[in-house]
Amino acid sequence: MLIITRKKDESLMIGDNIEITVLKLEDGSVKLGINAPRKTTILRKELYEAVKEENKKAMNIDMNLLKGLKK
């Protein structure tokens, strides 16, 4: 893991086209601004994990349910 220290209004770059800027530091939290191409999906990690888990659940298909569709 790379650890970088930034102050308010300082940025870091990921590749050539993603910029992350520290906008606000308050009460133990950090507000970040992210400039990235529109096609780039940006999710908080807890939301990303929830989506990943739901996708796994969706892949578990009950074959008995599919048999009813053949009729």
Swiss-Prot record:
It comes from the Bacteria. It holds the Pfam family CsrA. The keyword Lyase does not apply. One of its GO terms (molecular function) is mRNA 5'-UTR binding. It is found in: Cytoplasm. InterPro entries: CsrA, CsrA_sf. Keywords: Bacterial flagellum biogenesis, Cytoplasm, Repressor, RNA-binding, Translation regulation. GO terms for cellular component: cytosol. One of its GO terms (biological process) is mRNA catabolic process. PANTHER family: CARBON STORAGE REGULATOR (PTHR34984:SF1). A translational regulator that binds mRNA to regulate translation initiation and/or mRNA stability. Usually binds in the 5'-UTR at or near the Shine-Dalgarno sequence preventing ribosome-binding, thus repressing translation. Its main target seems to be the major flagellin gene, while its function is anatagonized by FliW. Homodimer; the beta-strands of each monomer intercalate to form a hydrophobic core, while the alpha-helices form wings that extend away from the core. Belongs to the CsrA/RsmA family. This is Translational regulator CsrA. It comes from Clostridium botulinum (strain Eklund 17B / Type B). The gene is csrA.
